[in-house]
C-alpha cells in the first residue's frame, strides 16, 4: 500500500492559478476554456498525493538541490516539493512554459 501525502497549495501558487484562470476568462474571452484548465490543474495536482517522487527533480540549481519537481499541464509547469517529514506535497508555483522559468522561480520561496 502506498503512502498518501497531504496536498498543500502555497499562496503564491494559488495566486498563479487564479491569475491564469482570470486572464483566460477575461482577457482572452474564453471562460469555458479557463474552467477546463482549472479543472485540469486540480486533477493533475491531486495525482501528486500518491507516489509524488515518481516525478524527477528539476535540473536547474538551486531548485534541484532543494528537491523541487515539476509536471506539465497543457502550457504550464506546476512546481512542487515533497516534504517527507510532514508527508506533504507543497505546490509552490504554476508558470506558463513560454516564460523564463529560472527568472520566475528565482523570486519564489522553496516552501512555506
Language-model regions: role of each:
Residues 1-67, 102, 110-112:
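Basic, Lys/Arg-enriched alpha-helical interface segments
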Residues 28, 73-77, 81-112:
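Enriched for short, Lys/Arg-rich terminal
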